[in-house]
UniProtKB/Swiss-Prot annotation:
Compartmental location: Cytoplasm
GO molecular function: ATP binding; four-way junction DNA binding; four-way junction helicase activity
Residues forming coiled coils: none
Sequence segments annotated as region (Flexible linker): 145-155
NCBIfam families according to UniProt: ruvA
Any single biological process term in GO: DNA repair
Transmembrane segments: none
Name of the protein in its database record: Holliday junction branch migration complex subunit RuvA
GO cellular component: cytoplasm; Holliday junction helicase complex; Holliday junction resolvase complex
HAMAP family, per database record: DNA_HJ_migration_RuvA (MF_00031)
Amino acid sequence: MIAYVEGRVAEISGNACVVVTEGGVGYEVHLPAHTLSRLPERGGQVAFHVRTEVREDALELFGFSTWDERQTFMVLTTISKVGARTALAILSQFRPDDLRRLVVEDDVLALTRVSGIGKKTAQHIFLELKYKLKVEDLPAGLVLAGGAAPGGVFRDALAGLGNLGYLEDEAAPVLKEVLKAEPDLDVAGALRAALKALARGR
């Protein structure tokens, strides 16, 4: 069973890329949208944690940038009515910590943002995730008072602060307080508010 692939990008087609190893073997690897969007040009080096899915008529590889994402994919595929393609679509919309946040917040309808998932299917998947997804793995820095997590806004705003030269240990607590006070902020708003707070603290 193939669990890891490293090599250069030979082709990109649809939601997959062909990775050619040093030994000259090419593997077609299906990827989440956010990973696909960050692929280097042809010839660039890549490495993926891989899950091999075997069907009667095909053997498919699904690649992920982190081991956590691969394990979350495996959890999703154990849910009835969720095949590998649906699991990949879910992980194209939500990172593992985003899914944990949905469980913490009891946000069932968020799953309907995934193409092909209606309200009834979302409820079924959500009930399974409650029992199968390790919510305790949600980083403490991503959890607000009352258990809610800022998810993508927190992550993207924190990355923006890092690009501006702020250390994570300095920026994360301030950003957490900003989102605790104003949970509806978008990334730009969270950045502006955090920068003001950081400027006052210096």
